[in-house]
Amino acid sequence: MTAMLRRNPALTREQFRHHWREVHGPWAMRNPEVFGFRHYVQLHAPTDADTNPLAKARQSPPAFDGVSEIYRNAPTASPEAVAALRAEFLEDEKYFLDIPASPVFMGEVRVIIG
């Protein structure tokens, strides 16, 4: 799963980065087996992402604040445990993300190099 993240407009980019890195990320990995997480990557946009010359040359839309990549196995917890943790997870995401502006992609990984 890959998510293109935009921060809650009530937060500064630094507040978003801090919460995602220091609160949400560690919280998500406390019980990785519940969701079946086996690999979790956070890509934090640079603070000057909105002035990136390549993005300007391509007439790109406003920069995302980050990208999340999660690779999963089948969850090992009960459906009830997964649902309960998912509800907690969503509450935290509502705090720091602009959820409607943060698209999520699910797909098949095809390694080209590496």
At which residue positions do the language-model features occur?
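Macromolecular interaction modules
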Residues: 1-114
